[in-house]
Amino acid sequence: MKIETTIFTFKISNSFEDWVKIFDSPEVCNFHKEVGIKPLYRGKSISDPNEVLVIHQAEEGVVKHVFSDPETIKIIEKSGHIYSTTKTTIWHSH
């Protein structure tokens, strides 16, 4: 199966530092491992500190499936991620 790199940009309702505490928490790290998602990068925009970029890698279709699940979306929104602002692009290396 192909490996996809997925790039998310979105707004947050809290500070980047507070959002990172949740994103880097043991619970979220375990969730990523359980579903087969490898976070590669997370950062905030220089021009807008409430805009975040996250890059994940996983087998083809995994990220799309996981992040379209209504239960996962509820958990994501608890972190301060404003899900309705999410823009997603998917990339393949070959």
Task: Tell what function each PLM region has.
Residues 1-73, 82-94:
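Short S/T/G/P-rich N-terminal loop/turn motif that feeds into the first structured element of a domain
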Residues 77-79:
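Short, exposed beta-strand-loop hairpins at the edges of beta-sheets
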